Amino acid sequence: MQVHRDIDNLPTFTNAVITIGTFDGVHVGHRQIINKLKTEALKINGESVIVTFHPHPRKVISSAILGVRLINTLDEKIEVLSGLGIDHLVIVPFTDAFANQPAEDYIRNFLFEKFHPDTIIIGYDHRFGRERLGDYKLMEKMAPQFGFKIKEIPKHIIDEIAISSTNIREAILHNDIEMANKLLGYTFFFEGEVVHGNKLGRQLGYPTANLKVNDPEKIVPGDGIYAVYAEVDGEWSTVNRGKSYDSQLTTPHSPLKGMMSIGFRPTVDGKKRVIEVNVFDFNKEIYGETMRVYVKKFLRAEVKFNSLEELVKQIDQDKIESLKVL
């Protein structure tokens, strides 16, 4: 898959079949569209092209900027899409100027001039241009003028995708990680920089990597204890990164197994929300490195214990439960 970030220097596409969307999560619902895209391109010996936007359009056209929580960062989206057999991914800078161009200009100056498409596949509810006045009917009306065909994604599929995206975010936030993974079609993951903590875990016999998630838009799971796989700066590749359509991990190398705690550590101080990962049988210094965490299963809610001894006893049990599912 070729990735294009400069829309003023795009290649000349051959019989381009394009679809347009944010594709946050690149989940099972999205793959219905992606499969249709590839099928239509194959029919005409053409190239499949996904057009997506960065930043997320809601950040530009909505006042509720703080409400934007994304399943994938841009790099993660690229990574997952790269395993799905698409020819081209075009990342369009989404600006006020782009959002406010007349709908006719969007079709003429953007879709036609940049892509010269053979076919455009869009949802029945696709809106574009100033005040979102452009719609499927306008595109259908202008298609003969510019010589492209237009195919509609049915309402039930679009609605299913919207529901899936919402359900995935809700599942991640509310600890139903197994449902999120099922809807995604792969194991949910996130990355963070390993930073210094108070090193209490070492004293308890369970050293942890404290993670700082640097992308404020990236969704992370709700508070609780989880069974996880981990990868440090790409050294251990434990997941087929979007190349598998199911939610099972593949293990070409020995995976790093572990457990993760997200929350306020009520037994210790309860003042700051932290993400801590205990990687089993691992003793390298990794401060400043990037850890990727694949969240496999929610184990239990965060609990305040009466003593550190009680906490350690529960952590012992958490490890046992983690190993059962990893």
What are these regions (language model features)?
Residues 2-9:
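N-terminal, positively charged, Ser/Thr/Ala/Gly-biased leader segments
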Residues 143-234, 256-259:
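Glycine-rich, Lys/Arg-enriched anion-binding loops that position phosphate/diphosphate groups
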Residues 198-326:
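Phosphate/ribose-recognition catalytic cores of enzymes acting on nucleotide-derived substrates
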